[in-house]
């Protein structure tokens, strides 16, 4: 039987909508049950305090969970499943939208794809002349602090898809989104390579921990 603490977030959601729940209540809704001597709301609150945010929580590995009394493999798998479900939702949504509706939508998608990755991943969104999404691909993966990018492969894929424009993105697992000299250099190389085939580079976004940098917003593209 559900306890009162487990019912409260559920009832609030049914009454006022899912957006009305706080981070603690939303987490409690997924955890469903607490641990011996600790109700689910208290457990959710302690977990968020430990990891700092939902981002920190969903990005954590199992070793970081071991210090929490009552949190075993089952709850860890459940939380990682939530993160993967969100990533796939945004991936499907991006494929099914007629066009990129806003920079905010693009950012949300990229954060869902790259947040929490332990290695640098370089992702490219390929667009047609009306900026409809043709495909998004993780073209390159690297180490904790570096990813090798080959501009010709980006152009080759764009030609194959008949793309008119691309959006570049990669993550910084360190959490700091500020671009390095190497990031700026490879962006320039990709732009020059794309220009030969009349393909526009609309932006290069770097995704950090709760922050991002847009080359277009800074006037670098």
From Swiss-Prot:
Keywords: Hydrolase, Metal-binding, Metalloprotease, Protease, Zinc. A motif (JAMM motif) lies at residues 170-183. The keyword Hydrolase applies. GO terms for biological process: proteolysis. Pfam families: RadC, UPF0758_N. Zn(2+) binds at residues 170, 172, 183. The keyword Zinc applies. Residues 99-221 form the MPN domain. Gene3D superfamilies: Cytidine Deaminase, domain 2. Belongs to the UPF0758 family. YicR subfamily. PANTHER family: DNA REPAIR PROTEIN RADC (PTHR30471), UPF0758 PROTEIN YEES-RELATED (PTHR30471:SF3). NCBIfam families: PRK00024.1 (NF000642), radc (TIGR00608). This is UPF0758 protein YicR. It comes from Salmonella arizonae (strain ATCC BAA-731 / CDC346-86 / RSK2980).
